[in-house]
Amino acid sequence: MTLPAVPVSTVAEPPPEAAPPSRAERTLDRALRVTGGVLTVWGGVLLALLELIFSTWAWELLQGRSGAAQALVGVGAVVVGVPVVVAATVLLGSFGHRSTGGRWAVVLAALPWFVVIVAGGVRTVEGDLALVGDNVLGLALIVAGAVTFAVVGFRHLVTPPPVR
């Protein structure tokens, strides 16, 4: 003797549609995205300035040493400096991506970073130069930052956008 079966649907019910956002919510969202973009641009400028200051300071510190002390300070500056640059660049690119909601947002950080780095390599009227050609640490930081921006940008562009 069998009992009658209860009918069960095998197709999942679609979730109820959410109401479209109000005008105030859209305005707030747009304002937050613009603010995130502005913060990302200023973060790129600040990151480049800090990299130039660190590379110049570490290079001068390295030039004041000789022998084993020079090697120890140089290795320490590279071991600390390059991973910090890579981590800060990844964090800045991710912040730009999340705060603006656009996959292209890493450009907001990368363009001012490149402009400041290039400006650091140009001699001023007074003769000041933030990034000299023999500063190997500065060149390593530039390469690390540029490659990281390229990888982060490529990663954000290749990843499919989230389903909303």
Model-predicted regions and their roles:
Residues 2-43:
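Cytosolic juxtamembrane helix and N-cap/initiation of the first transmembrane helix
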Residues 105-117:
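Central hydrophobic cores of alpha-helical transmembrane segments
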Residues 34-38, 79-97, 106-107, 139:
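Hydrophobic alpha-helical transmembrane segments
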Residues 144-164:
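Membrane-water interface at the C-terminal end of transmembrane alpha helices
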Residues 94-108:
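Membrane-helix interface "capping/anchor" motifs
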Residues 47-82, 117-140:
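Membrane interfacial helix motifs at helix-loop boundaries and amphipathic/re-entrant anchors
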